Regions:
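Short, acidic loop-to-helix structural element flanking the phosphoryl-transfer center
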Residues: 77-104, 110, 142
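Hydrophobic residues in well-ordered beta-strands that form the structural core
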Residues: 15, 104-106, 181
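Active-site neighborhood of HAD-like aspartate-dependent phosphohydrolases
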Residues: 1-42, 174-175, 185
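Short beta->alpha linker loops
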Residues: 19, 44-47, 71, 84-88, ...
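Short, surface-exposed acidic
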Residues: 33-41, 59-68, 124-125
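Asp-based, Mg2+/Mn2+-dependent phosphohydrolase catalytic module
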Residues: 1-3, 91, 100, 110-186
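An amphipathic alpha-helix signature
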Residues: 21, 25, 37, 45, ...
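A metal-dependent, Asp-based hydrolase signature
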Residues: 45-75
């Protein structure tokens, strides 16, 4: 029976910090919000939008925060040329496909995840993709990882998770699976 390898997207398979920042900057600037890149990288990247949205647009109403997030997702593709692919991890992923089911579990949207995988020619490398739309509880909750394990009928002991962010690492640890921390890529 095949085991399971689960991969995070942002910061693990791709450095998308600049992509996400530029998309948010595009939709925030006309509204009078001007976040700095270092602030975004330090305080926002790797966290759920529900947490960092109010940091980017202080005082914005919940409806305005939802609109900002949707507009960001809509223009995300304009900045994909700023993403950096983790070539070494993709090489490992392709080798692992012989012995492992592969799953992508990301806090990002399905549309944005699909866009970046297509941009870099990696659309077919996952047996399962779970995105923000598929879960009701974001990382650090392990729900997405648990759903992937249930989908393939594997145990945490038969699973390894590749993650980079503190919230993703906490989710992987809560899931009880093996953990490979990707450091220094983004």
């Amino acid at each position: 029976m095949k085991k399971l390898a689960i991969f995070d997207l942002d910061g693990t398979l791709f450095d998308t910090t600049r992509v996400n920042f530029l998309a948010y900057e595009k939709v925030l600037s006309p509204r009078g919000f001007h976040p700095e890149f270092d602030f975004f990288r330090r305080e926002c990247f790797g966290h759920d939008y529900g947490y960092f949205g109010p940091l980017l647009a202080p005082g914005a109403s919940p409806a305005e925060l939802r609109a900002i997030h949707q507009e960001k997702k809509d223009c995300y593709g304009e900045f994909l040329d700023r993403a950096v692919k983790n070539e070494h991890l993709f090489a490992l992923l392709h080798l692992m496909r012989r012995e492992y089911h592969t799953a992508l579990v990301t806090a990002g949207s399905r549309a944005n995840s699909s866009q970046i995988l297509q941009q870099f020619g990696e659309s077919d490398c996952f047996d399962l993709t779970l995105s923000a739309e598929d879960v009701t509880r974001a990382k650090p909750d392990p729900q997405g990882f648990q759903m992937a394990m249930a989908h393939f009928g594997v145990t945490p002991e038969e699973t390894i998770i590749f993650e980079d962010s503190p919230t993703g690492i906490a989710a992987a640890q809560a899931a009880g699976a093996g953990l490979f921390v990707v450091k220094g890529f983004n």
